[in-house]
UniProtKB/Swiss-Prot annotation:
Transmembrane segments: none annotated. GO terms for cellular component: cytosolic large ribosomal subunit. HAMAP family: Ribosomal_uL29. This is Large ribosomal subunit protein uL29. InterPro entries: Ribosomal_protein_uL29, Ribosomal_uL29, Ribosomal_uL29_sf. The gene is rpmC.
Length: 65
């Protein structure tokens, strides 16, 4: 997910996306611990998505953009 895609979402959609990403990260960590995770590249991707979402939320809080 690109940061420009996130900026195009409303605040409620962003919060929902953040919640979904946290759930996905939890599930991926669970699969990793049970050795069921096939694509290890998914973990950093989800973490980066969460960071992007939090960045946009902070920008809106500070009214930077």
């Amino acid at each position: 997910m690109n940061i420009s895609d996130i900026r195009g979402l409303s605040d409620t959609e962003i919060k929902k996306k953040l919640e979904d990403s946290h759930k996905e990260l939890f599930e991926l960590r669970l699969k990793l611990s049970t050795r069921q995770l096939v694509n290890h590249r998914e973990l950093p991707r989800v973490k980066n998505d969460i960071a992007r979402i939090l960045t946009v939320m902070r920008e809106r809080e500070l009214q930077i953009r």
